[in-house]
């Protein structure tokens, strides 16, 4: 911990939500630092070891049923260890994170109390980054359907080509013996919005996208933004809060 020596408390009323958030981070990185502050609530930012993808989590104070924090503080956590504990959390469990300078105590309540304690890692203080990319096209869609798209194509190739022209979004994969494509029209019921200042096309790693669909279970909608041969931005809104969400950035790879 870097900051106040007082205990910091975060209370989540829905166990499934906090479990999926932890899994979304652990899918990208083993260790990460998050910040808790009276102004911003909970903020996490971490770059994967290959520096190909970044994950960010934003949970404003209003997201929590209870939050106690005196001043901005940073905490380093081993998410691989934390996710093992969170796998025991049921959907209707109430989960508390109690943080000191040395430890994270996870309290799970549902008829009785379960307590687990993790030692903290040295934190690495950060400033929230946003990529300096002019995203020219995007689609906002039912988040539950994005995993269907990825799973449909993952057996075809190790890369996926995404293109958006404002009227349709196409997801394609091909190998020497097979080519598959999924087309989502602007008028399809899964689409909430689609736009393009100019058409965009880029290729991304399938393995990374597979790991980036974990928040779909706790999000009503996901927004994909892109530009030709530029990184992809995915944002999952969480809990009906405008500022709450899980965000990924994924670097593009060479063309197919």
Predicted segments, located by residue:
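Polyanion-binding surfaces on beta-sheet-dominated domains and ring/shell assemblies
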Residues: 160
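DNA polymerase sliding clamps and clamp-related checkpoint/processivity subunits
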Residues: 1-26, 31-155, 163-256
């Amino acid at each position: 911990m870097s900051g106040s020596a007082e205990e910091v408390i975060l209370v989540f009323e829905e166990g499934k939500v906090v479990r999926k958030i932890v899994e979304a981070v652990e899918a990208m990185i083993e260790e990460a630092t998050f910040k808790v502050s009276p102004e911003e609530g909970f903020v996490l930012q971490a770059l994967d070891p290959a520096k190909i993808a970044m994950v960010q989590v934003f949970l404003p104070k209003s997201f929590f049923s209870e939050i106690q924090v005196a001043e901005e503080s940073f905490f380093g956590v081993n998410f691989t260890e934390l996710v093992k504990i969170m796998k025991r959390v049921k959907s209707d469990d109430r989960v508390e994170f109690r943080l000191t300078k040395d430890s994270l105590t996870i309290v799970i309540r549902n008829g009785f109390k379960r307590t687990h304690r993790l030692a903290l890692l040295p934190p690495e203080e950060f400033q929230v980054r946003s990529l300096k990319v002019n995203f020219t096209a995007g689609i906002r869609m039912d988040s539950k359907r994005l995993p269907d798209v990825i799973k449909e194509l993952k057996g075809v190739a190790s890369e996926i080509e995404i293109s958006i022209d404002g009227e349709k979004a196409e997801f394609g994969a091909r190998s020497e013996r097979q080519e598959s494509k999924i087309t989502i029209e602007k008028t399809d019921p899964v689409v909430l919005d689609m736009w393009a200042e100019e058409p965009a096309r880029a290729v991304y790693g399938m393995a990374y996208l597979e790991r980036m669909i974990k928040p779909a279970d706790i999000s009503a909608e996901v927004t994909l933004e892109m530009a030709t041969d530029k990184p992809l931005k995915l944002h999952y809104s969480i809990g009906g809060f405008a500022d709450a969400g899980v965000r990924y950035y994924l670097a593009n790879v060479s063309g197919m």
